[in-house]
Curated annotation (Swiss-Prot):
InterPro entries: Neocarzinostatin-like, Neocarzinostatin_fam. It comes from Streptomyces macromomyceticus. Belongs to the neocarzinostatin family. The keyword Disulfide bond applies. One of its GO terms (molecular function) is DNA binding. SUPFAM superfamilies: Actinoxanthin-like (SSF49319). This is Macromomycin. The keyword Signal applies. Residues 1-32 form the signal peptide. Binds non-covalently to a chromophore which is the cytotoxic and mutagenic component of the antibiotic. The chromophore binds to DNA as a weak intercalator and causes single- and double-strand breaks. Keywords: Antibiotic, Antimicrobial, Disulfide bond, DNA-binding, Signal. Disulfide bonds join 68-78, 120-125.
Amino acid sequence: MLQNTSRFLARAGATVGVAAGLAFSLPADRDGAPGVTVTPATGLSNGQTVTVSATGLTPGTVYHVGQCAVVEPGVIGCDATTSTDVTADAAGKITAQLKVHSSFQAVVGANGTPWGTVNCKVVSCSAGLGSDSGEGAAQAITFA
């Protein structure tokens, strides 16, 4: 789990954070860029399971799926307790179940350094994915 968490933070955290900072809802566009959809994405309850679906991915590539937030300028904090790895199918698609939290203990960096508490009712949070090569996307999530 620690190895998966470290990979998630080192690769996906940055990817998810950058994607989240640029645009919270990134459907796949016509040139095949990765797109992600989170269902449901609004009015969530703490501990609820959402479905993260993505298209436009590199087939056979492992993607790290998780919940993150920008915790400081240029710093992404993620919930390492629920991150998971999923391999894109031959069509470049994935579907994963992800438990999300309205508040979580964020970790940052490849070593999973504790950062502190993230309250997704106060700051913007996202669910998304990223690969070791930095390919990924994210969508904003909100809690009731």
